[in-house]
Amino acid sequence: MSYNPYAYATSEQNGVNDRFSHTPQQQRPMQIPRNTPVNGQGNANMNANVNGSGGGFPFQDPRGSMAFQLGQSAFSNFIGQDNFNQFQETVNKATANAAGSQQISTYFQVSTRYVINKLKLILVPFLNGTKNWQRIMDSGNFLPPRDDVNSPDMYMPIMGLVTYILIWNTQQGLKGSFNPEDLYYKLSSTLAFVCLDLLILKLGLYLLIDSKIPSFSLVELLCYVGYKFVPLILAQLLTNVTMPFNLNILIKFYLFIAFGVFLLRSVKFNLLSRSGAEDDDIHVSISKSTVKKCNYFLFVYGFIWQNVLMWLMG
């Protein structure tokens, strides 16, 4: 007869088992072994073991591995060596322009409060005074639009362009003369007017301002040029409102004049603030004659040219 060690269980142990068998389901506390590390020590030890495994070899760059070289050679053979070289140049240029793309992304950092204040600044620029138009600098860089209402942005010009085209499309549909080809013509003509406006502003500042003096970037000028869609949209909506003809003309005239004041002060004050007064590397100041020429140019550009351009676009 074989020996059974469980046959000699004591009555005390049987009593304990019976007691637990008649007791409702109880949750026993989980016991953590003494040798088990707590919290992140286990992960740290595990990472240390993983990093230290393999005989202590350091992590190698995957570009120097045999698999990467084989894949690179196979890809170059598949698309051709010339195409592969062109692909590498494109990737290098995209990597080099990463910093520039990050700078462009700052022009889209807007908030609801900024958009409302910017609309007030465009429609009622007289309430902002004549000294509150300069952008705010912090650590040598301008603050993003969400922190400075005087900072230009790309959000409002892009949304203004889309809204302007959609409103024009809706008006054509209400008249019963909608045509998809006209939509393409309107979009292309609007973009052509914007490019022409940008070219005139950039060329005028280039001829008047010394090249040693820092001026606006092309993106910043595009932002200021794109703000014209705010009065254009309101002028479009006025055509569907029943009112006296003289009142309609008066409101449109005010919108165009207000935009001219906004454009004149925004470009003027921020252009003169970049004359090197706070820059140690540039010791060139704008002469009084240059300031007068800039004022004359911005006056003609903001009040005369903008009215003619918006009349053609509207």
From Swiss-Prot:
Keyword NAD set for record: no
Role description: Required for fusion of ER-derived vesicles with the Golgi during ER-to-Golgi protein transport. May be involved in proper membrane localization of Rab GTPases.
Annotated disulfide bonds: none
Gene transcribed to yield this protein: YIF1
Composition-biased stretches (Polar residues): 10-32
Subunit field text: Component of the YIP1-YIF1 complex, composed of at least YIF1, YIP1 and YOS1. The complex interacts with the ER to Golgi SNAREs BOS1 and SEC22. Interacts with the YIP1 family members YIP4 and YIP5, and with the Rab GTPases SEC4, YPT1, YPT6, YPT7, YPT10, YPT11, YPT31, YPT32 and YPT52. Interacts with BTN2 and SNX3.
Family affiliation: Belongs to the YIF1 family.
Positions in the Lumenal compartment: 175-188, 239-243, 314
Cytoplasmic side: 2-153, 210-217, 265-293
Listed name of the protein: Protein transport protein YIF1
Entry annotated with the keyword Transmembrane helix: yes
InterPro entries: Yif1_fam (IPR005578)
Bilayer-crossing regions: 154-174, 189-209, 218-238, 244-264, 294-313
Coiled-coil positions: none
Gene Ontology CC terms, in alphabetical order: COPII-coated ER to Golgi transport vesicle; endoplasmic reticulum membrane; endoplasmic reticulum-Golgi intermediate compartment; Golgi membrane
